């Protein structure tokens, strides 16, 4: 069973519910009193009888509310708001008659009291409507702005099921900006207003390292503390140093890119000049690319990509790919070292060819078998017999004599060649056998 004091405390805690304000309207109070009387007379209830504190607070004929004027109601709301008594403010607003409520509905103090009660009752939609549709004095803006932001924070925490960090709160403030009814429209950047930041920038341009008296003077001018002023100057100097270093890196990168492009252009011009005109060292025999001698792949290995500086340091020949001028000097030097060997080989080949051309034809020492057969075919057997020599005509006799002379000369040559061969090789047969075979 609840005592009257406990029930009063519970009712004060239940003031956060939205239905509670409607329950304390004059018509509802009469209904509650009737229900209380019927419940007490008929059947026992789990809860005790309604204490007499409700009629005393909510009855429209109560001397505390019905006899008050509009100014008295406004002053009472202001006093309760200043004291921070939200429960007392809620109970007082519930006892105001509807006629009096309409009279003070547009008053700023009454609107602030309603906004405060809605904020603590978690009626955030009603709170937003009050703050957006009514204009308030600038001296109350900070408190109302805090309620605006805190209401949005609580809504987001309820939706997400977790508390918000500083970054989350910053995003909520950006997503739900304050209405102009509680805000002068001036942006706050880095927790300082734009007017304050402009004044700090002016002092920073004059002296980036202010002494303590200047910090104190600047703090009084901006409404900040000396520590805030010192931190702002420190952070600004650090940002300027970082920006200067970044700009320096960008300038160096642009210069390097420009020099590399100039070098690439000069390299292209140099390569074009080397391909278009012959060098003074090379002989101007043929300017086509097919006659340009190429270096062997073992002397200049292919460079892997990406280029490895340690591999280039280990193999100096790979550095030639980085310097076209050095590459051409090495190329010309290699050609000068290679040209004498090529000239010697060409000279040796030409001497061999000349000797082959100048060599005289060898003298024939023997008649071929075909020639001998042709000679024999021209002489008939009757002409060769000794008995027929007288019957031959003079022309035939002359021909036979010429043939005999040729045969004798051939036989002599054969005998000479056989003798020379037998002198060199004793195994050969005698000259007589050779002559007989040739005959």
From Swiss-Prot:
UniProt DNA-binding residue ranges: 183-243
Pfam families the record matches: Homeodomain (PF00046), SIX1_SD (PF16878)
Region named Disordered: 253-293, 344-365, 379-439
GO CC annotations, alphabetized: nucleus; transcription regulator complex
SMART domains noted in UniProt: HOX (SM00389)
CDD domains in the record: homeodomain
Skewed-composition ranges (Basic and acidic residues): 398-428
One example GO MF annotation: DNA-binding transcription factor activity
DNA-binding recorded as keyword: yes
Gene knockout outcome: RNAi-mediated knockdown in hermaphrodite adults causes embryonic and larval lethality and head morphogenesis defects in L1 and L2 larval stages of offspring.
GO biological process, one term: neuron differentiation
Function: Transcription factor which binds a motif with the core sequence 5'-GTATCA-3'. Plays a role in head morphogenesis. Involved in embryonic development. Required for cell specification of the RIA interneurons. May cooperate with the transcription factor vab-3 and phosphatase eya-1 to repress transcription factor ets-5 expression in non BAG neuronal cells.
PANTHER family documented for this protein: HOMEOBOX PROTEIN SIX (PTHR10390), PROTEIN OPTIX (PTHR10390:SF33)
Subunit composition and interactions: Interacts with gmn-1.
Protein name (database record): Homeobox protein ceh-32
Organism taxonomic ancestry: Eukaryota, Metazoa, Ecdysozoa, Nematoda, Chromadorea
């Amino acid at each position: 069973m609840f005592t009257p004091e406990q029930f009063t405390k519970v009712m004060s805690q239940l003031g956060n519910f939205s239905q509670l304000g409607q329950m304390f309207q004059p018509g509802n109070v009469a209904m509650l009193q009737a229900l209380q009387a019927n419940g007490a007379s008929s059947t026992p209830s789990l809860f005790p009888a309604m204490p007499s504190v409700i009629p005393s607070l909510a009855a429209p004929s109560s001397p505390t509310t019905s006899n008050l004027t509009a100014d008295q109601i406004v002053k009472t709301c202001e006093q309760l708001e200043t004291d921070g008594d939200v429960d007392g403010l809620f109970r007082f607003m519930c006892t105001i008659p509807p006629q009096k409520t309409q009279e003070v509905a547009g008053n700023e103090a009454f609107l602030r009291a309603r906004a405060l009660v809605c904020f603590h009752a978690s009626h955030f939609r009603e709170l937003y409507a009050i703050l957006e549709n009514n204009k308030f004095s600038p001296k109350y803006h900070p408190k109302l702005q805090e309620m605006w932001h805190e209401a949005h924070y609580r809504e987001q925490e309820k939706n997400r099921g977790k508390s918000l960090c500083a970054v989350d709160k910053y995003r909520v403030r950006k997503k739900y900006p304050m209405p102009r009814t509680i805000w002068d429209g001036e942006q706050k950047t880095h927790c300082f207003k734009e007017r304050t930041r402009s004044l700090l920038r002016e002092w920073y341009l004059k002296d980036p390292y202010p002494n303590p008296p200047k910090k104190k003077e600047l703090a009084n001018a901006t409404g900040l503390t000396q520590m805030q002023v010192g931190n702002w100057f420190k952070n600004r100097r650090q940002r300027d140093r970082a920006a200067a270093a970044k700009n320096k890196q960008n300038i160096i990168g642009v210069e390097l890119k420009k020099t590399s492009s100039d070098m690439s252009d000069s390299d292209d011009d140099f390569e074009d000049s080397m391909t278009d005109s012959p060098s003074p060292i090379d002989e101007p025999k043929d300017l086509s690319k097919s006659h340009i001698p190429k270096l062997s792949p073992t002397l200049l290995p292919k460079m892997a990509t990406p280029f490895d500086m340690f591999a280039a340091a280990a193999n100096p020949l790979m550095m030639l790919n980085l310097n076209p001028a050095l590459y051409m000097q090495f190329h010309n030097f290699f050609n000068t070292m290679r040209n004498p060997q090529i000239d010697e080989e060409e000279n040796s080949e030409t001497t061999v060819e000349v000797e082959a051309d100048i060599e005289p034809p060898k003298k024939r020492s023997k008649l071929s078998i075909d020639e001998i057969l042709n000679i024999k075919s021209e002489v008939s057997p009757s002409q060769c017999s000794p008995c027929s020599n007288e019957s031959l005509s003079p022309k035939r006799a002359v021909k036979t004599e010429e043939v005999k002379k040729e045969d004798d000369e051939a036989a002599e040559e054969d005998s000479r060649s056989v003798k020379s061969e037998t002198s060199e090789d004793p195994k050969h047969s005698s000259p007589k056998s050779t002559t007989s075979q040739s005959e």
